[in-house]
Every structure is written in C-alpha cells, then in structure tokens.
C-alpha cells in the first residue's frame, strides 16, 4: 500500500512539473500571433517550405528546427524582458538555416557545412527576401563560436543561444525519448 501511495505521489509530482513547464514555456498571445504571421509571410514570399524536405538534427527537419529557434528566441526575449525588435528576431531566426539543401547527403559541396552554411543561408535569404541589417547579422553570425566572428546585435546573440539550445534538445531527443518541443 505504501509503495502504491509513493508511486501515486511521484506521478502527481511529475504531472504538476510537466504542467508547470508547459505553462512557463508559453508565449503571450501577441508573440504567438507575430510568429504565425511571420511564418505565413515568409512562406508566401520565398521557399521556406523547402526546409521541410531535409533533416537538421536527429529526427527534426530544418523547418521544424527553425520554428523551434524562433519560438525559443521569442520566449527568451519575453522571459528575460530584453528589449529587442521582435519582427527582426523572428525573421532572422526563421531564416538562420535557409541553406536549402540536405547536408547529410554525401556531396563534396557539403563538406565543412558548419562553417559554410551561414553564408549560403544569407545568400539565399537575400535573394528571396528584403532583409534589414539585424536579420542579416542573425543569419551570418548564428554559428558563433564555431565561426569566430561574434554577433553584433542583441537579436543575433539571442538567436545564437536559442539555436544551440534547440540543437542540443533535438539531437538528444531520440536518445532519451524525451520530447523537446511539441
């Protein structure tokens, strides 16, 4: 009987913690709207949907990874109460890996992908969209410190951090069967 009570208490605690985590990782309605509108705009103007065709980390597509980074960046901005340009933050986050190829395929052009893809992503994004300076900086500098030139604006620093956090979660997810994002 005692073991059953302990097990029930443990399950209740886990459920409370999951609910608390879900609530604490939610965006305000306004930020959710901004994210949805920006995704819609980028899909209409360019080739954002092509990111669905290739995987990024583990079982996560490049598209899903970009959404995760954009969401996490907005969450960090809200949670830490950092003054940023939310639209630039979201656009830069959604386009930071806009390189439009499957880097897992055996192809000599994909060698040193980690070092080269920010430049490719920036070139593709500039061809398909009108970018401001912050959005360009986000895309070009998100691989710091692998690429030793640091971000130059707060938005780029936040996306750089969010990218590392999401990449870790997405890579570890299949190993531990833990859902990083819904």
Predicted regions and their residues:
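Metal-dependent phosphohydrolase cores
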Residues: 1-182
């Amino acid at each position: 009987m005692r073991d059953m009570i302990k097990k029930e208490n443990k399950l209740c605690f886990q459920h409370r913690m999951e609910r608390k985590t879900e609530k604490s990782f939610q965006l305000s309605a306004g930020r959710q709207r901004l994210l949805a509108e920006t995704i819609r705009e980028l899909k209409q103007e360019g080739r954002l949907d092509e990111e669905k065709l290739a995987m990024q980390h583990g079982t996560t597509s490049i598209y899903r990874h970009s959404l995760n980074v954009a969401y996490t960046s907005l969450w960090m901005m809200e949670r830490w109460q950092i003054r940023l340009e939310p639209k630039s933050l979201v656009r830069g986050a959604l386009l930071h890996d806009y390189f439009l190829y499957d880097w897992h395929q055996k192809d000599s052009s994909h060698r040193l992908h980690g070092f080269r893809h920010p430049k490719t992503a920036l070139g593709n994004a500039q061809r398909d969209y009108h970018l401001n300076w912050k959005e360009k900086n986000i895309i070009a500098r998100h691989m710091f410190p692998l690429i030793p030139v640091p971000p130059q604006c707060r938005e780029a620093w936040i996306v750089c951090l969010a990218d590392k956090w999401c990449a870790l979660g997405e890579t570890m997810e299949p190993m531990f069967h833990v859902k990083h994002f819904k």
